[in-house]
Amino acid sequence: MKILTHNMMACTKKQCMGKGFPLKVECTEQIVLEQEFNYEFTKNIYPKLDWAGIAEISKKFNIPIQLDTTKHSLEDEEFLKTLHSLLCNLKVITGSLTCPNCQRVYPIDKGIPNMLLREDEIYQDIKE
Amino acid sequence: MSRPEHIAPPEIFYDDVESKKYSSNSRIIEIQTKMAERAYELLAIPETAEGLMLLDIGCGSGISGDVISDAGHHWIGCDISQHMLDVAIDREVEGDVMLRDIGQGFPFRAGTFDGAISISAIQWLCNAEKSHHNPRKRLHTFFQSLFNVLTRGGKAILQFYPENSAQIEMITASALRCGFSGGLLIDFPNSSKAKKYFLVLFTGNNNIMPSAKGVDGAEEYEEEDDNEVKYSNRKRDRRRVTKSKGSAQHKTKDWIMNKKDRQRKQGREIKNDSKFSGRKRGPKF
């Protein structure tokens, strides 16, 4: 699971609607990819990012990045490059995701997050 | 045609063996790639656009995702079969995949994706696999969640194999109820083999439905699927020829003797062999 995916994800249990993100990452194994910097993509994805999620990842993996959104400039190539490598090059292989709202833990195995809900959790949704 | 959704639920049907087919069977790969290419074409992403974020629903081993990667976009895929996703990881697909039942909606923040494609997945939602499943409710959750995760002006192209017209109606009605506009597009409506159903959905209103391929039936023969029909015709012709050759040997002396032996073994009452058995009759006057 890339950090980009993590940034887009949210817990979908009904009680977490609108507040089930950013998911907390626990990571026991990770790899670093080497993908080419893609200017267009980084620019397109920028407005969709959740900065609370970026902040957490930046702290967790010790990657310094400008977090003050008022100081960002899409002309600053250095900043975009850091952002791109944070989003696309860091991949969590094993670990888990925890919802900040309901504390549900989603395991990550072989790079695939398991987001399946159990029957009782869906039922919970229907009731509410 | 056999329907896998009648055999077992998707997470069980696409087991180790069935998933491996998707990485090794060139025919499956070719068909899937063709459909994904068509779906991507229907998304009508302008050629200048690059680096968009797309969702692949029921991504499986990531064949359809490869089409997106080739076009220079990023994708995230959801699938319910662990084995299929393992194949995707083995193939080192560029996008990210996750295990998720699409009938439970998507685990993403609202307005994340610029578009979505799905190849042969949503017909699975029409079946109740577990006691607590309700197809209508699951379809509703699916479309509602899809509507949420798409940006305004986003499009979703969902290719599926409906079992009957009731299913088409159930799926389309559910999509429209969730706020989508758009409708069903049928490629090659007059061909039983090349016929493909695409559900074209827009989150905005001001969109023009793309036109279907092969409506007048003339174009149809350009399709790969129909080449195959020609080939199988040839095969059938060849079979017919060998059969007629067989009937030429029919009623020769050897054939008659063989037949009498066979029937004797079956215990039937058979005339004794004589010098006249199987002999050619003289010319008739």
Task: Give the location of each predicted region.
Chain B
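A short beta-strand submotif of the Rossmann-like class I SAM-dependent methyltransferase core
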Residues: 118-121
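A short acidic, Gly/Pro-enriched loop at the edge of an enzyme's catalytic core
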Residues: 103-116
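C-terminal lobe and adjacent flexible extensions of AdoMet/dcAdoMet transferase-like proteins
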Residues: 195-285
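Class I SAM-dependent methyltransferase SAM/SAH-binding core
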Residues: 53-105
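Conserved class I S-adenosyl-L-methionine
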Residues: 1-49
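A short glycine-rich, Lys/Arg-flanked "PGG" loop and its adjoining helix->strand segment in the class I
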Residues: 134-152
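Conserved S-adenosyl-L-methionine
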Residues: 180-191
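Conserved beta-strand signature within the Rossmann-like core of class I S-adenosyl-L-methionine
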Residues: 153-160
